Design a protein with these regions (language model features):
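Flexible hinge/capping segments at coil-to-helix
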Residues: 1-27
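Generic preference for hydrophobic
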Residues: 2-3, 27, 93, 107, ...
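Active-site-adjacent beta-strand anchor residues
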Residues: 3, 29-30, 57, 75, ...
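A bilobed periplasmic-binding-protein/Venus flytrap-type ligand-binding module shared by bacterial periplasmic
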Residues: 3-9, 104-115
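Secondary-structure junction motif
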Residues: 11, 25-47, 115-119, 123, ...
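Structured helix-beta-strand junction loops
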Residues: 13, 23-25, 70-71, 88, ...
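Hydrophobic hinge/microswitch elements
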Residues: 33-92, 142
């Protein structure tokens, strides 16, 4: 999901298209190597030259959110994070147009994994924190 400052041109849009991202005044991205950053760069089909000219790289999503709230640019946040925002922050959230980027969590172990029961408990705990509607890909969603 896009987190867009009121001063950015994208704030007036109801949904964000990948082509719109390049029109933003400032794009705040996590440092290279963060999987969320890499997935969003791939999804928006940004080249490394674009990210170096357009984006500011730091290590904290919270810092980016404060920058956006103070009127500076756009960043991306996971949908689960958007659910935890207060009303004034939710006003800054813009969903992506179809296709919607979606992330998938997969647990893979060796067939003889000794802590299989522990892994099953972990999976149940993760699922308890994620709305059931997010457990499967929906129409218009694409894995990033």
């Amino acid at each position: 999901m896009g987190y867009v400052s009121r001063e950015d041109a994208l704030f007036k849009k109801e949904v964000i298209r990948t082509a719109d991202v390049a029109q933003s005044s400032q794009l705040w991205l996590l440092d290279e190597g963060h999987c969320f950053r890499d997935q969003m760069v791939r999804f928006c089909q940004m080249k490394s030259s674009q990210t170096s000219q357009l984006a500011y790289n730091l290590g904290s999503m919270e810092t980016f959110m404060r920058m956006v709230e103070s009127g500076m640019g756009i960043t991306f946040i996971p949908e689960l994070a958007a659910m935890q925002l207060c009303d004034s922050q939710k006003e800054l959230v813009r969903p992506f147009a179809i296709p919607v980027p979606t992330r998938q969590l997969i647990m893979i172990t060796n067939r003889n994994f000794i802590r299989q029961a522990l892994l099953e408990v972990l999976v149940k705990e993760i699922q308890a924190g994620v709305p059931k509607a997010m457990w499967k890909l929906g129409a218009g969603q694409v894995l990033v």
